[in-house]
């Protein structure tokens, strides 16, 4: 009775339960389809073939069915790299779909070749795409095979596709406003951006560039620059585009790594693009490719060791072993050349072709002479600032001093040099260099100073105390501008630090920090203007006059600061200097007793200091630290790139003489001017056509040289690409290691090998056909178990192989083997040595088959045993051998001559087997486990047992075969 009143208590903290069910149910596969896919997964060729044959007759299996992962039989075969089953499926016209894309993504080269060569027979019924299940489609509609292959960067697959003459859509320009781009963006902006990203990801593939581009280095340069610019427009995919841009830069650098001689390096760096307009086509040894690399900011390419070694050789031309000399010797040499630069310049003016004239044209000598000239200019600026020549300070328009007259030629030389540089390189290239902008500002200030001094000298002749001059007096403005230009001139010397390996990275870091300061100033100015407006609005009403202040001084520069926030400009100055602690707190006080106003003003002033000092200033320090660390992490590349730009400015023709000698016309200049004037204004008649023939000859020679240079360049590029591809494949194999795919491939190979050997030895039974239901199969398996062997019923489906009777012919070298003696129980030592003897046994089995190769026909179609039967009855093979030994008495009645195995009928063998002690045959169905995991584990266990049994049988067969006895053997493995 107590149980009637007993109530079970649920101690679970969550007593309510949520019923779960499958909301998006999918179509379940039939048992036959599961068995079909399972056979493809295991690599059972015979079963798959029989299933396909019966599907064509009975239509009981959908050969295009998919597993829960959305994989069809063809995709499973591709994933397992089972090309035999793939070919079998294609021969039966399975639906291909995205199989080619799937094979490309899995990088199965054999499958890609098979699918590319596959052509559906004419007249076959095509499976409509709409009837296939597209819910598992893994590829967007814009993905093509060549694009996917380029994404994987598989050289072999890309080569196969390029040989088929595939194409890739050409992406439009970054800011293209054509109808196609605008309409595509309006319809689906995400798809438009993704499609553009996929195209560029394919175009940036190193393997595709190496295969399809005539000039892969130039292609990588332009594509990397375009991707960098695109990352600034497509901010949503900025990281992806920057990664692709870096990939192109590394490809060009790696391609240059493969150069093995100075000749190859010179051919690469001196090659010029035929379509390049900014380079002179008459120059063939001006490092044109390197100039293009600098233009596109290919820092990795420029800083590559091979490139730097060639540049160093050209830079120190005429100074062999310069780097191995002591630093004292180097310093004395540079100082000597620097002091002699006026004489070298004069020698070049007189005779440019002389030894001294050619000596000053060397890049290193040119650099030393220009540096010495600039240092001389700075020294004269120092003399001018110290006022060595005493003048009357009260003269409103003073005449130029001797030092100022000496400075004037240098200023004119600087201006003339900048004009020539802008003329040669173009305005766009000129303004992209920040040092050129600094030179422009410096020269402008010097011109303004000279102009104002001339105005003051002409307009103001008298002398007047300086305290009485007006604020905007030309002399005062000229002196202020001259002081600013002196600062810029001194800072311009920092650009020469790039030539030094220690000061160069610091100079680059300083330039990067200036960008951070500009970014910081934008935010700081906004905060400054906001608080200046508020404080000025608050204290505008309390402005006092100067006569009311001590010493008649008004402003924050007085001994006692006052009226700090009376005007907007004064407020801006006060807040700026407060950052440096130069403003006192009492400036927030007012003469009237308005304590609330003072409190609000002090609070606003304190809040500004907190924001500007604690927040913004620390943010600036963090930004500058980040910039310095970024440069420090890539200091070598950044410095070498900046040094190369400095060196290249001295490699070019022209600009040989330093200021002020560059403003002196040389005889060569007069000769060029005379030729131009003669050809322009006094053209001569050419009745005989000599000039025309001369121009034609020069044009032909120039084009011939260009063709020869291009041919040499293509040969070098071909060699570089071959070396790069070989190195890429070698590195990929080295760094790949063992992955899960390798183990899956090994498992698939073992499974396929097992089924092939079973078919070869005839150890597989006739499975039942599809018409047998799964219940009947289980019942028949239970009846075949014999006495008491209780087997668990499992739902399984079998395929009828339908093999015909065939006879197997073999040489009469194998006699009947005697009954093996010894206990059948295996010790622990034997079980521990299973795997060690499996390898030699398989080798012996292969040797035995090779001996039969000339006489053995196709295996007989005896009933084949299943995998599960082999697992349960492992002693079946030994019992067959025992059965063959019992037939020894019958075989002795036969003659000792050669007896072929084909003379023994299958019925006689079966009758002899029934009269012997051989047990009942195993079940004749090939069970396909519904669980993939359980079937895989059973597969490995059964493979180990079968290998063990084969090994022992092969040892005994080889032993008897070696004795040379000739007797018939009838075995059934």
Swiss-Prot record:
Effect of mutating residue 870 to E: Found in a patient with mental disorder and obesity; uncertain significance; no effect on protein levels; does not affect cell membrane localization; strongly reduces channel activity
Cytoplasmic face residues: 1-325, 361-363, 420-433, 498-512, 625-973
Membrane topology designation: Multi-pass membrane protein
Keywords: ANK repeat, Calcium, Calcium channel, Calcium transport, Cell membrane, Disease variant, Disulfide bond, Glycoprotein, Ion channel, Ion transport, Membrane, Metal-binding, Repeat, Transmembrane, Transmembrane helix, Transport, Zinc
Location, primary (coarse class): membrane
A GO MF term: actinin binding
Effect recorded for residue 893 to T: Found in a patient with mental disorder and obesity; uncertain significance; no effect on protein levels; does not affect cell membrane localization; strongly reduces channel activity
Segments traversing the membrane: 364-384, 405-419, 434-454, 477-497, 513-535, 604-624
Disulfide bonds: 553-558
Tissue specificity note: Expressed in brain with higher levels in fetal brain. Found in cerebellum and occipital pole.
Region (Disordered): 766-794, 810-837
Stated regulation of activity: Activated by G-protein coupled receptors via direct interaction with GTP-bound GNAI3, which increases the channel sensitivity to phosphatidylinositol bisphosphate. May be activated by intracellular calcium store depletion. Calcium channel activity is enhanced by MYLK, that promotes its subcellular localization at the plasma membrane.
Binding site for Zn(2+): 172, 176, 178, 181
Catalytic activities: Ca(2+)(in) = Ca(2+)(out)
ANK repeats: 30-60, 69-97, 98-124, 141-170
Residues the record marks as carrying a glycan: 461
Pfam families: Ank, Ank_2, Ion_trans, TRP_2
Stretches for region Essential for binding to NHERF1 PDZ domain: 971-973
Entry's Gene Ontology cellular component terms: calcium channel complex; cation channel complex; dendrite; growth cone; neuronal cell body; plasma membrane; presynapse
GO biological process, one term: calcium ion transport
Function: Forms a receptor-activated non-selective calcium permeant cation channel. Mediates calcium-dependent phosphatidylserine externalization and apoptosis in neurons via its association with PLSCR1. Acts on distinct neuronal populations in the hypothalamus to regulate innate behaviors including feeding, anxiety (flight/fight/fear), socialization, and maternal care.
Noted disease: Loss-of-function variants in TRPC5 may be involved in a mental disorder characterized by maladaptive behavior, anxiety, autism, postpartum depression, extreme food-seeking and hoarding behavior, hyperphagia and obesity.
Complexes and interactors: Homotetramer. Heterotetramer with TRPC1 and/or TRPC4. Each subunit in the homomeric ion channel (via ANK repeats) interacts with one copy of GTP-bound GNAI3; the interaction is direct and activates the ion channel. Interacts with TRPC4AP. Interacts with NHERF1. Interacts with MX1 and RNF24. Interacts (via C-terminus) with CABP1. Interacts with SESTD1 (via the spectrin 1 repeat). Interacts with PLSCR1. Interacts with PKD2L2.
Name of this chain's protein: Short transient receptor potential channel 5
């Amino acid at each position: 009775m107590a149980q009637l009143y007993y109530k079970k208590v649920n101690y679970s903290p969550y007593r309510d339960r949520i019923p779960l069910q499958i909301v998006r149910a999918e179509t379940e596969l039939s048992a036959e389809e599961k068995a079909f896919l399972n056979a493809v997964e295991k690599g059972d060729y015979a079963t798959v073939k029989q299933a396909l044959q019966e599907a064509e007759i009975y239509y009981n299996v959908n050969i295009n069915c998919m597993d829960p992962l959305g994989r069809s039989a063809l995709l499973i075969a591709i994933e397992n790299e089972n090309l035999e089953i793939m070919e079998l499926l294609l021969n039966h016209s399975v639906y291909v779909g995205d199989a080619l894309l799937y094979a490309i993504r899995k990088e199965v080269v054999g499958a890609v070749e098979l699918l590319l060569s596959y052509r559906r027979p004419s007249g076959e019924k095509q499976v409509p795409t709409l009837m296939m299940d597209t819910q598992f489609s893994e590829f967007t509609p814009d993905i093509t095979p060549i694009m996917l292959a380029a994404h994987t960067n598989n050289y072999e697959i890309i080569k196969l596709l390029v040989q088929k003459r595939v194409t890739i859509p050409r992406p439009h320009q970054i800011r293209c406003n054509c109808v196609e781009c605008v309409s595509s963006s309006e319809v689906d902006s995400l798809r438009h951006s993704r499609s553009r990203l996929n195209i560029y990801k394919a175009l940036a593939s190193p393997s595709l560039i190496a295969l399809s581009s005539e000039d892969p280095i130039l292609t990588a340069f332009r594509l990397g620059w375009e991707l960098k610019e695109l990352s600034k427009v497509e901010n949503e995919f900025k990281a992806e585009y920057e990664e692709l841009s870096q990939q192109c830069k590394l490809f060009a650098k790696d391609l240059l790594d493969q150069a093995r001689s100075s000749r190859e390096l010179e051919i690469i760096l001196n090659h010029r693009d035929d379509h390049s307009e900014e380079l002179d086509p008459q120059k063939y040894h001006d490092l044109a490719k390197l100039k293009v690399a600098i233009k596109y900011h290919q820092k990795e390419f420029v800083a590559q060791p091979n490139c730097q070694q060639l540049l160093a050789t050209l830079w120190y031309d005429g100074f062999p072993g310069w780097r191995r000399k002591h630093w004292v010797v180097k310093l004395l040499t540079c100082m000597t050349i620097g002091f002699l630069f006026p004489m070298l310049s004069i020698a070049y003016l007189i005779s440019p072709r002389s030894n001294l004239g050619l000596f000053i044209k060397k890049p290193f000598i040119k650099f030393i002479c220009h540096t010495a000239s600039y240092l001389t200019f700075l020294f004269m600026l120092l003399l001018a600032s110290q006022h060595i020549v005493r003048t009357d300070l009260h003269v409103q328009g003073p005449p130029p001093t001797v030092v100022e007259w000496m400075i004037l030629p240098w200023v004119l030389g600087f201006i003339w040099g900048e004009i020539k540089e802008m003329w040669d390189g173009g305005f766009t290239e000129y303004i992209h260099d920040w040092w050129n902008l600094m030179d422009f500002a410096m020269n402008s200030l010097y011109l303004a100073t000279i102009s104002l001094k001339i105005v003051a000298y002409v307009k103001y002749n008298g002398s007047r105390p300086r305290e009485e001059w007006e604020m905007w007096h030309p002399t005062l403005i000229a002196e202020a501008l001259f002081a600013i230009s002196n600062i810029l001139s001194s800072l311009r010397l920092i650009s020469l630090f790039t030539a030094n390996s220690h000061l160069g990275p610091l100079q680059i870091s300083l330039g990067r920090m200036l960008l951070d300061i500009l970014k910081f100033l934008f935010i700081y100015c906004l905060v400054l203007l906001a608080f200046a407006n508020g404080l000025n609005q608050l204290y505008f009403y309390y402005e006092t006059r100067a006569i009311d202040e001590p010493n008649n001084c008004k402003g924050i520069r007085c001994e006692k600061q006052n009226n700090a926030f009376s005007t907007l400009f004064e407020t801006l100055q006060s807040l700026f200097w407060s950052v440096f602690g130069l403003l006192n707190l009492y400036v927030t006080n007012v003469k009237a007793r308005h304590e609330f106003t003072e409190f609000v003003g002090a609070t606003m002033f304190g809040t500004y200091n907190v924001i500007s000092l604690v927040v913004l200033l620390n943010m600036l320090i963090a930004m500058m630290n980040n910039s310095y660390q970024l440069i420090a992490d890539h200091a070598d590349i950044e410095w070498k790139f900046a040094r190369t730009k400095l060196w290249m400015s001295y490699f070019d023709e022209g600009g040989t003489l330093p200021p002020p000698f560059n403003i002196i016309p040389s005889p060569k200049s007069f000769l060029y001017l005379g030729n131009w004037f003669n050809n322009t204004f006094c053209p001569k008649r050419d009745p005989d056509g000599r000039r025309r023939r001369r121009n034609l000859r020069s044009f032909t020679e120039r084009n011939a040289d260009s063709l020869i240079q291009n041919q040499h360049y293509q040969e070098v590029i071909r060699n570089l690409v071959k070396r790069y591809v070989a190195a890429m494949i070698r590195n990929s194999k080295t760094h790949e290691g063992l992955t899960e795919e390798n183990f899956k491939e090994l498992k698939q190979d073992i499974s396929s090998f097992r089924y092939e050997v079973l078919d070869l030895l005839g150890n597989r039974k006739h499975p039942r056909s599809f018409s047998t239901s799964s219940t009947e199969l289980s019942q028949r398996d239970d009846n075949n178990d014999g006495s008491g062997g209780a087997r668990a019923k499992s739902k399984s489906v079998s395929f009828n192989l339908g093999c015909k009777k065939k006879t197997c012919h073999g040489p009469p070298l194998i006699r009947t083997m005697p009954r093996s003696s010894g206990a059948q129980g295996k010790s622990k030592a034997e079980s521990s040595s299973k795997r060690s003897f499996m390898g030699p046994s398989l080798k012996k089995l292969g040797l035995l088959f090779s001996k039969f190769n000339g006489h053995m026909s196709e295996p007989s179609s005896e009933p084949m045993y299943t995998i599960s039967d082999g697992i349960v009855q492992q002693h079946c093979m030994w019992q067959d051998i025992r059965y063959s030994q019992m037939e020894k008495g019958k075989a002795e009645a036969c003659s000792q001559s050669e007896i072929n195995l084909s003379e023994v009928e299958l019925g006689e063998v079966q009758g002899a087997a029934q009269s012997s002690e051989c047990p009942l045959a195993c079940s004749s169905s090939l069970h396909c486990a519904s669980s993939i995991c359980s079937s895989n584990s059973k597969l490995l266990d059964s493979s180990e047992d079968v290998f063990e049994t084969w090994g022992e049988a092969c040892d005994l067969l080889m032993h008897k075969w070696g004795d040379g006895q000739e007797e018939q053997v009838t075995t059934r493995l």
